[in-house]
């Protein structure tokens, strides 16, 4: 919990070797337990993953499946900067396993029989976005065929440009003055033992949008939205809608409420001052030398020393799907119904024309919103 290097398990190993040390999907016993996935499981998972992302074609030659994680040291709250949906771990394993399954030729044959035709020259890459340094790691690239060498070079050039631009944007939020060493200062924060604010995590989160990506493409959402590319017209029986509303939407609400509570009343719902923390076993932290284990986020995760960085707002959820389908998910799932009927989040529906058309008012009732004319 107070590691002085980011990942002690791989510290000192060659980067190329680390990139090849990945999860295996073949069924085998490990420690007396079965691991891996049999052929039927792989096909079912591949179809579920692609349909959940509305990624059923056409496919590019290289498709990045990118998880996220953070790089910090001497930080007992490091898991709070990793993936909430991964239980406080990075998304590396998920991305690499998904890529391996989707690159399996037998899986692709079975997917074609289910209406998803992945071209033979499409290769999926498991990747990891380091949200502290904005480096994008590409895994298992030694398995890329020689025919994709130019594609890989172009991808790396584009990623390098995107990384540079994002670091400059992040620097402003971190109070780093723009200059020749701006990007290096962003990276240095990830290795600084004394840094209490290596990155802002999900501070500022305010909305969750499940709709075709075309609805938000080109709009600057300020890094405050959880986005899901979802097309309800491709969603048979609205199974994907149920998955989105019962899993990522719920997790996003939990994250939002954690930031909300840690901002409005850090003494009760947050973890207090990170500088005063003492780690207790592997369980949590105390503020000072006594008291109860702290919950929530430390003060430094929501405040920069002079102002709040997080604006405490209940999550606004916008979903493009028929009202009947959304109501069906609410009616069948207590965890969703409790969130929306008790007003822990705001729920809105987007019409097929792309307009926010209805607001949820509780107990499966909706209020139609007036359409405003453009000036």
Write out the residue ranges for each language-model feature.
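Extended, H/D-rich, highly charged conserved domains that either
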Residues: 1-20, 213, 220
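Residue-identity detector for threonine
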Residues: 2-4, 10, 35, 56, ...
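Intrinsically disordered, low-complexity linkers and terminal tails enriched in Pro/Gly
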Residues: 18-35, 173-181
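Catalytic or ion-translocation cores adjacent to nucleophile or general acid/base/metal-coordination motifs
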Residues: 25-62, 69-149, 220-221, 234-241
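Beta-sheet entry/capping signal
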Residues: 59-64, 205-207
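Short His-Asn-centered micro-motif
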Residues: 65-67, 210-211
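Long, compositionally biased intrinsically disordered regions
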Residues: 147-375
